[in-house]
UniProtKB/Swiss-Prot annotation:
Pathway: Amino-acid biosynthesis; L-methionine biosynthesis via salvage pathway; S-methyl-5-thio-alpha-D-ribose 1-phosphate from S-methyl-5'-thioadenosine (hydrolase route): step 2/2. Catalyzes the phosphorylation of methylthioribose into methylthioribose-1-phosphate in the methionine cycle. Contributes to the maintenance of AdoMet homeostasis and is required to sustain high rates of ethylene synthesis. This is Methylthioribose kinase. It is an enzyme of class 2 (transferase). The gene is MTK. The keyword Metal-binding does not apply. It comes from Arabidopsis thaliana (Mouse-ear cress). Its EC number is 2.7.1.100. InterPro entries: Aminoglycoside_PTrfase (IPR002575), Kinase-like_dom_sf (IPR011009), Methylthioribose_kinase (IPR009212). PANTHER family: METHYLTHIORIBOSE KINASE.
Amino acid sequence: MSFEEFTPLNEKSLVDYIKSTPALSSKIGADKSDDDLVIKEVGDGNLNFVFIVVGSSGSLVIKQALPYIRCIGESWPMTKERAYFEATTLRKHGNLSPDHVPEVYHFDRTMALIGMRYLEPPHIILRKGLIAGIEYPFLADHMSDYMAKTLFFTSLLYHDTTEHRRAVTEFCGNVELCRLTEQVVFSDPYRVSTFNRWTSPYLDDDAKAVREDSALKLEIAELKSMFCERAQALIHGDLHTGSVMVTQDSTQVIDPEFSFYGPMGFDIGAYLGNLILAFFAQDGHATQENDRKEYKQWILRTIEQTWNLFNKRFIALWDQNKDGPGEAYLADIYNNTEVLKFVQENYMRNLLHDSLGFGAAKMIRRIVGVAHVEDFESIEEDKRRAICERSALEFAKMLLKERRKFKSIGEVVSAIQQQS
């Protein structure tokens, strides 16, 4: 079988593809054996085919982009080129944070296909762990490290402007995925759209209130402008709890197909916003045996620790590289400790506010927009689910409109507790 043109693979044709690709076959022993490979299609996301492949001497994952959105169908076309940007970002971020990004073994641009490390059990999607009430002792440490390194080292704090513009230009090609985000995060929840849904009839008035909130629309317009215009760093672009796989001592970030040079706060906010959604969903998963109160406190500690560790590590990287190639703040201008500290405090304050705003926007779209989260969807009783969603929605609306009043992540955590 020829693979010179794009062909959607199935379990049978994937065997032929792997055996004809040394970079893959050598990883799992398929180059030395005619034994059948064990292949399982496990894609549960919105966009792609995902296969787990096990051979005589190893395993790997194959991810293939389709020319449409899988969860909707061919009526919503989507470029296969997103696979190129995903593979490129996995490699770039993997170089910067190798402990927290799976290795890429092979990329085929024609087939829109990536072969990468299989994150074997007990790795599970973080979102599923949060639903199950599992604590991860290294989560805040690992995620803050990943975000600090990937965001700092792809920004003008480390790049010179020529290098940065070249990198920005390359990722401008991921325009379709950016436009999808613009639509589902910054537009559809604030207007009537066939793609929107919510827990009806319980949240009918809540969804209408979002569409009629002028102050909310003013804030979301500012965030959309920042998302479209601010090429601050190479961001993952979809860093929710479904894009992280975990064990008790491992944290791996996957699926950066939405990556581009955008505002740092979009990644930080997406991640923290999804932790906040997980917090508000806990009451829907509580039982007589486990009221989830202790687990909710763990989530809040994780939120606070993640930002505080990120802040500390980001500033440390800045200090270590203040005389390096970065051209955002030239060393001969910001040339004393006092002025540099002032600049850093201002930068991180703005970044916190950006992160809170984007996090709130991501929360809102998951409640009254398209593509909801399993944290809420797995709450079987509609009324119970709606109560949890309403609390999260009210908090997100407040956070979006009043984000600039928060001086620390601790104040945000206190506000979450008051809302619950």
